[in-house]
Regions:
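C-terminal catalytic "cap/lid" subdomain
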Residues: 1-210
Length: 210
C-alpha cells in the first residue's frame, strides 16, 4: 500500500484542532507521513527578515528549519508519532507501527528542484515529498474550508501556495480538509481512507508556469 502524505498546517498550532487531527491521524489504517507547517516559527523568520534584511535564499533555509521545529513539537504530542528526517526513517517508523513526522531540513534544504522563494511553503514541500516516496495522494489540512475545488482558484485565494501547481506531481491526487471535515471525523476511528475535498487541476494556465 502506498503511503499518504498529510500536511498539518502550522496555523493549527495551539488550537484544539491540532490535537483532534493528531488523534485522527495516529489511528490511520494506512501508512502515512505527517508534514509540519512552519506556523509561528516561520512567521518569526518573516519578521526577522524585515529587520535584519537577509536574503530570500537565507529565509528559505530558515523557513524549512522552522518546519523542523514545529515537527519536533508535533512528534511529542502522541507516543505513536516519531521524528523522521529521511526515507529510511519513514520505513523504520512504519515497521514499528508508528506515524513518522517529517523534519524536512536534511532532505529539502539542498534539493535543486525546490525553488528558494517564499512562494514555496510547506504545501509545496509536501507535494515534493510525495514524489520522493511514491505517494499517490496528498492531504492538506487547513484551518478553513475551501470555497472552491479548483486548484488555480485556491492559489488565487491564498489557500495554497503559488508553487503548488508546479510542484504537484502529475499523478498525485490532492485533497484539502478543513474544520467541517474534522467535525465529520470525530469519534470515527480508525481513519481508513483519505478525508477532505478532492481538488481538481483546472484553469491552471498562467498559474503553474512560474
Amino acid at each position: 500500500m502506498r503511503p499518504l502524505v498529510v500536511k498539518l498546517g502550522g496555523s493549527t498550532a495551539g488550537h484544539e484542532e491540532m490535537r483532534e487531527w493528531i488523534d485522527v491521524l495516529v489511528t490511520a489504517g494506512l501508512p502515512l507521513v505527517i508534514v509540519p507547517g512552519g506556523g509561528a516559527f516561520a512567521e518569526q523568520v518573516r519578521i526577522s527578515q524585515r529587520s535584519l534584511h537577509f536574503s530570500d535564499d537565507a529565509a528559505h533555509d530558515m523557513a524549512i528549519l522552522a518546519m523542523d521545529q514545529f515537527g519536533i513539537a508535533i512528534a511529542e504530542r502522541h507516543p505513536r508519532l516519531s521524528k523522521a528526517g529521511a526515507i529510511e526513517d519513514f520505513r523504520r517508523a512504519w515497521r514499528a507501527g508508528k506515524v513518522p513526522v517529517w523534519l524536512p531540513s536534511s532532505m529539502a534544504r539542498g534539493a535543486e528542484d525546490i525553488p528558494r522563494s517564499w512562494d514555496v511553503t510547506s504545501d509545496s514541500l509536501a507535494a515534493w515529498l510525495c514524489e520522493q516516496i511514491g505517494a499517490e495522494r496528498l492531504l492538506l489540512i487547513k484551518q478553513i474550508d475551501p470555497d472552491d475545488r479548483d486548484l488555480g482558484e485556491l492559489v488565487k485565494g491564498g489557500v495554497v501556495d503559488p508553487m503548488l501547481p508546479r510542484m504537484l506531481g502529475e499523478k498525485t491526487i490532492l485533497h484539502i480538509a478543513g474544520p467541517s471535515i474534522l467535525r465529520g471525523l470525530r469519534g470515527r476511528f480508525p481513519m481508513t481512507g483519505v478525508p477532505g475535498q478532492h481538488i481538481m487541476r483546472q484553469a491552471l494556465e498562467g498559474v503553474c508556469r512560474l
